[in-house]
Amino acid sequence: LPICTGLLESGSIHFIFKDFILKNYIEILKNYDYIIYTRFDQFYTGNHIEGRPDKILIPEGEDYFGVCDRHAVIPRKFITEYLRICEYIDSKATSKYPSSYLNCETTYLNQLQENGLSAYIERIERYQFTASLKNDKTNWRISKYRLFGYNDLYIKYPDEFIDSMYNKLKNHSLYKVIMEEFSLFINYLNLITRRKLGKYKRQFFKI
């Protein structure tokens, strides 16, 4: 790389995957109207959203000063440019963007801006969250919240889970959510109750 990108370990892996797909499977991807680019550790709280013409669908949240890089639905006509992130990193175009804080999300957004794709981004309500097994290797967040009702599975980013379940409850009746996703609903109640109790505890004891 011509400059220090600030992208180490898991950040570099994200981009290598995209470059590998671009160089080896792009013609296969062109057989599909939409391509879902996602991580293996996503737990969905409902059916996957359908793609939309002329829109790159990215869930809300987890932007870290850029844009969330964990999931996207891309129309076929955008997929080649979308995957060219390593070409962007190796180009002089990187000098056009601030480098005081670089991570996966900021570099991802810079690349989409450079490739002319940022104008097509549409943020959608989150309907999935990141999960992990207890002993999964991680470079960043260590999972602390157990997902009760699921064998040895943990919630990695609590905000993702809470947002996903909040959206599900907002868009469906309480009866439907309880009947279809009872375990997730109980976990949601448990997590938001813990947060509220923690907030009151800090206020009462001035922690």
Regions inferred by a protein language model and the residue ranges of each:
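ER/Golgi luminal nucleotide-sugar-dependent glycosyltransferases, focusing on the catalytic module
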Residues: 1-207
